[in-house]
C-alpha cells in the first residue's frame, strides 16, 4: 500500500477549474497510443489510454491505460489493476512490475520480462476521481465508498462499450462480458470487495443491459479488517523487534483502539499508536534511519521515499508530450501526483472500516478469491491476513481451514516462491522475498500467481509434512506453547504429530499423578491426627493427674495442607508471568503521513 501510513507530506498541486480537458473519445481507436515517448518504436505493444466521462458531463473523468494481450488477445481475459491509498495512482503498478513497461529513468522505458500482458489483457485505472490523471472539477472528491463503487461500475461499463470486443450478445438483449478479474494491493483490500459486491448486485438487476462476468479477484497485502490489522506486535515479535513483555504492553494499550472502533471512530490516534510505538522504539538515535514498515529488510532515511522508483513515474507522467500521447490532461497548470492528499483526506474516516463481511458474502456466492502477502511487509502483514481469513464463515470454511499447506516453486528459481493454503474457492499465499509490493519485488512470482489463478491451476507443487490442525481466530490468541521432547537419534525421533501427542500425554500424566499425591497427603494427615488423638486419650486415661493437651484442629491442619499446596504449585509453575515493560512511543504516525501504493 505505499502510503497506507505515509501519505507524503508534500502532496500538492490540486486541480483547478481552469483545466483544459482533452476531447472525449467514444471509440477505442481514438484512444490508441501511436507514439509513446521513451519507448523503442520497434516494441510490439498494442495499447490504449484515455479518460471516460462519468454522468455524461465533463466534470468528472476517469483515466485508464489498457494493454492488449500479447497472445490470443481475442480470448484472453481482462485483468484490472488497482492501486491503493486511497488516492494513489495505478501507474505505480503499471511501471513497477505488472505491465510490459519499466522506467529506466524519467525518460526511458524498458521492457518487463514478466509482464502480465503475456497471457491477459490489462487495464490500469486511476480512481477514485481526483487520483493520478483522473479529473474532478473543483476538487469535488467523493466522500463515501458506495459512491466510489458506483463511479467505478459506470466507468467499467462504459469502457466495455468503448472496447466492445470484450462484449458478446446474450439472452434478452443483455451483453455479457468476457472473463474479468480484479487485482490490486494495499487499500485495494477495500476497493476490490466493495466493487465486486456492487458488480454482483448490478448483474442481478434485470434493468441493466451489461452483465460483467467477474470470474475472480486477487488482493495483495490488502487492508481488509482493521480490527485485526491495526495490531502489529505479534508480527514485530516474530522479527525479534519486541520482547514478550513489550508485546503484552502493546496489547494492553490496543484496547483503546478497539474501543474507538466499537464506538464508530474509524480513524483514531489510538489505532495508529501501535505501529508508531514499534517503529519509534527500534529507531536508533537522532539521525538514524527508520524501519521501513513496507519492507522490514530496509532502514530508510525517509520511508515516504519507498519505493525508490516512484519519483521517475511522477516526472515521466508530468511531461507534456507524455500526457498528449496517453490522451491525458494537457493543461499546463496540472500536476500529476503519485498520491492525492485531497482524496486521502476525504476518505480517511473509512480507514478503520472492515470489508470482511463483503469478502465473506462474495465467497458464499462462489466468487474465486486469492489473497497473497509478501512476507517482509509489516504494514499489511501475513499474520494479520491469515488471522482475518480465519474469521470468515462461508460454505467453504471447513475445506479451507483443514487444507494442507503447500510449498510452491516458480520455474527458474531453486528457492520456494511461497507457501499456499487453498480450500473451497479461497487461496492464501505467503510470498517469499517480497515486501508490500509483490510485483515489484518478485515480478516472476507475481506473474506466476496471476497465470495460475486465471487458468485455475493450483499451487500444489509439494505438500508440507507438518500436519494441519483446524483453527479459528481465537486460537491465534494463545501466547504460550509447550516444547516437545525430540530424540537425538534420527531413527527413533518422533514425527511432528507424534511429538505433540507424546508431549500432551506427558502433561496429562503429570497432572494425574499430582492429584494422586495430593489425595494421599490429605488422607495421611487425617490418619495422623486421628492416631494422635487416640494416643493422647489413652495416655490421659492411664494417668492419675490431669494434664493440659494442645491440639491442632482438623480445620487448621487442612488449611495448613492447602497453604503448603499453594506454595508447592504457584502460578509460576502453571503459567508464565511476564513483566510488562513500557514501549517508547513517537507522536508521528506513518499512517497519518502517507497512505499506500
UniProtKB/Swiss-Prot annotation:
Pfam families according to UniProt: Peptidase_S10 (PF00450)
One cellular-component annotation, GO: membrane
Chain's role: Protease with a carboxypeptidase B-like function involved in the C-terminal processing of the lysine and arginine residues from protein precursors. Promotes cell fusion and is involved in the programmed cell death.
Name of the protein in question: Pheromone-processing carboxypeptidase KEX1
Top EC class for this record: hydrolase
Membrane-protein topology: Single-pass type I membrane protein
Family named by the database record: Belongs to the peptidase S10 family.
Coiled coil, from the record: none
GO MF: serine-type carboxypeptidase activity
Keyword Nucleotide-binding: no
Known glycosylation sites: 395, 425, 472, 503
